[in-house]
Amino acid sequence: MASPSSHLLFLVLLCSIPSSYLTASTIPVSVFNTIPHSDPFQRLSHLAFTSIARARHIKNAQNAPTSTTHLFPYSGAYSISLSFGTPPQSIPMLLDTGSSFSWFPCTKRYVCRHCSVSSTGISSFIPKESSSAKILGCMNPKCGWVHQSFDPNTSCQECQLQKTNCTQICPPYIILYGLGSTGGIPMVETLNMPHKKISDFLVGCSLFSSGQPAGVAGFGKGVSSLPSQLGIKKFSYCLVSHKFDNTPKSGFLSMDPESDSNKKTGNLSYTPMLKNPVRAGTSALSDYYYVGLRRITVGGQKVKVSYQQLSPDSDGNGGTIVDSGSTFTYMNQAVFDMVSNAFSEQVKEYKRAETMESQTGLRPCFDVTGHDAVKMPALTLHFKGGAEMALPLENYFFAVDDVQKEVVCLSMVTDNTLLGPELISGPSVILGNFLMQNFHVEYDLTNERFGFRQQSCS
């Protein structure tokens, strides 16, 4: 069986070109690694822990005096390389469909604490070396994109006194996420795409971070997201398998500026994107892509998950979102227990690997030592409209090679007491990128539908 020691690199994709400027295109790029652990058990445990931390942050989404994104460090996430400034500076940024605000490490004095690499080894944008870099003004409407409750009449007092040529800047941001934070100054800069320059692109110039060595390219549904600022009507990606994490292989990201209003991509199964719930006093849930997961089957047998768990209520409790920034798929305790128990009850050929379960926090795990071909019950997700996602084994079981034995673990997580009591609010299911390996995934923003098909992405 393949060793997991290479399973946790950050794979790099490069996006194509924005709306109304070009036709869609794709460009492959290289890989980089910031995983802090070399031991496979520590790596697997770390992924499980950070997947839970990210899920807790997504579920606890709320407006605050500071801007918030939904990212955690060392997640096994995928990234894109974007070029900003005049002359251009290329910066790797994590592809995140669970948040909208984009930011990058900024200035030569950028400090990253509790990171796996030193601050000097992190790619940072240098505003002084760009003639097009501008700090965002306080009266600029985009300041309200950063601070959702922002009121320029009360926050920009200097500009109220000095109506013309006001130099007051948009307030700094503090971004909170599952296991850390980042902070900096909002700015507008030229985004350099392969054949076009997009001026005045809103991006955060982060001066410090904790536990976050790379910036974020926000692909959520908010007005500050990259697709929204570029007017993209459709974007898609294909995530290469994590087994290629130690190779130059990469997937791709494509952004389509000229999407036909009704045309479907060949051989894709589609399910409607659901209307985002509105939690009282907050618009934080508006970034997420909700889809209608209607049924889960294990080995062809329906898992008896309640409708209330799979459908969001008016307060944003329950439902399913797609999140490229999460590694392992998260399920609320009630949903997870039914799914994991279904595997435990149906798998009779292999013994439970309880030591591995205690070491990693994943369950169930099975000892498959001596078996050339591992067989597990099929896992299928059934969506609204009839779309079915039949998953290959590598997308829902993680292989761990020990010196003495070979073990596979269900690559899904649920909340636990390590980070406090379980949060029952927010989405019940968060579909992570491990589940989407070797799937062509499409976000049709015009028609509000989510499409997918299985294919090789390498």
What does each model-identified segment do?
Residues 2-93, 101-185, 247-252, 261-291, ...:
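Disordered propeptide/prodomain
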Residues 179, 195-196, 300-302, 386:
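Detector for glycine-centered tight turns/loop "hinges" at secondary-structure junctions
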Residues 162-170, 178-288, 403, 407-457:
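Aspartic protease core domain of the pepsin/retropepsin superfamily
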Residues 99-102, 109-111, 209-210, 243-245, ...:
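Solvent-exposed loop/turn segments at secondary-structure junctions
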Residues 99-103, 216-219:
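FAD-binding core of FAD-dependent oxidoreductases
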Residues 106-109, 226, 336-343:
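Short active-site loop/helix that positions an aromatic residue
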Residues 2-40, 74, 85-87, 95-100, ...:
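Aspartic protease catalytic domain
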